């Protein structure tokens, strides 16, 4: 196995909070998958939840080397937790097609947050 891509992102949680205060759930609707949306709606810390998902998706887009463009959208990257609570990544649509084209067989996600920041790193393996 070889590393195909590495991406890291850091998000200031207060900026996400300000966007939500200004525009309601528009950012969440753009960023979250349907499954993530269902969690976000009832989450005890929805701003923090959204900030962490945003960080993972930005990191994934960087790992793929594309950014969010050319048919890729935030909601095509879905963050979920495995049975041990470890964050994982599931792809849909154009993101899944790109992963297949590049030969991605494994994706590693690490996620951390503190009072003011959320950060994530994604590694793609062939």
Curated annotation (Swiss-Prot):
It is found in: Cytoplasm. Its EC number is 2.7.8.7. Pfam families: ACPS (PF01648). The keyword ATP-binding does not apply. GO terms for molecular function: holo-[acyl-carrier-protein] synthase activity; magnesium ion binding. GO terms for biological process: fatty acid biosynthetic process. It is an enzyme of class 2 (transferase). It comes from the Bacteria. InterPro entries: 4-PPantetheinyl_Trfase_dom, 4-PPantetheinyl_Trfase_dom_sf, ACPS, Ppantetheine-prot_Trfase_dom. GO terms for cellular component: cytoplasm. Signal peptide: none annotated. Mg(2+) binds at residues 9, 58. It catalyses: apo-[ACP] + CoA = holo-[ACP] + adenosine 3',5'-bisphosphate + H(+). Keywords: Cytoplasm, Fatty acid biosynthesis, Fatty acid metabolism, Lipid biosynthesis, Lipid metabolism, Magnesium, Metal-binding, Transferase. Its cofactor is Mg(2+). Belongs to the P-Pant transferase superfamily. AcpS family. Transfers the 4'-phosphopantetheine moiety from coenzyme A to a Ser of acyl-carrier-protein. NCBIfam families: acpS, pantethn_trn. This is Holo-[acyl-carrier-protein] synthase. It comes from Enterobacter sp. (strain 638). The lineage of its organism: Bacteria, Pseudomonadati, Pseudomonadota, Gammaproteobacteria, Enterobacterales. The gene is acpS.
